[in-house]
C-alpha cells in the first residue's frame, strides 16, 4: 500500500484521468473529492461491498 501525506487543497493523481483532492479535515473525518471519467465507478467501500453482494446473490 502506498501511503501519502497531503494537506487540505492538495491533490494526488491516479493514472492520467483520476484526481483525489483533500477538501477538509474536521476531527477524525477527512473530506475528499474525486474527479474521474464517467466510465470509472467511484464508491465508498461499504457501498461497493453491498453492490458486490447483491450481484452475487442474483
From Swiss-Prot:
It comes from the Bacteria. GO terms for molecular function: mRNA 5'-UTR binding. InterPro entries: CsrA, CsrA_sf. It comes from Psychromonas ingrahamii (strain DSM 17664 / CCUG 51855 / 37). Pfam families: CsrA. Belongs to the CsrA/RsmA family. PANTHER family: CARBON STORAGE REGULATOR. GO terms for cellular component: cytosol. SUPFAM superfamilies: CsrA-like. One of its GO terms (biological process) is mRNA catabolic process. This is Translational regulator CsrA. It is found in: Cytoplasm. A key translational regulator that binds mRNA to regulate translation initiation and/or mRNA stability. Mediates global changes in gene expression, shifting from rapid growth to stress survival by linking envelope stress, the stringent response and the catabolite repression systems. Usually binds in the 5'-UTR; binding at or near the Shine-Dalgarno sequence prevents ribosome-binding, repressing translation, binding elsewhere in the 5'-UTR can activate translation and/or stabilize the mRNA. Its function is antagonized by small RNA(s). Keywords: Activator, Cytoplasm, Repressor, RNA-binding, Translation regulation. The gene is csrA. Homodimer; the beta-strands of each monomer intercalate to form a hydrophobic core, while the alpha-helices form wings that extend away from the core.
Amino acid at each position: 500500500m502506498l501511503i501519502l501525506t497531503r494537506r487540505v487543497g492538495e491533490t494526488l493523481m491516479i493514472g492520467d484521468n483520476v484526481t483525489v483532492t483533500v477538501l477538509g479535515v474536521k476531527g477524525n473525518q477527512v473530506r475528499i473529492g474525486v474527479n474521474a471519467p464517467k466510465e470509472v465507478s467511484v464508491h465508498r467501500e461499504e457501498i461497493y461491498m453491498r453492490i458486490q453482494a447483491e450481484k452475487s446473490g442474483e
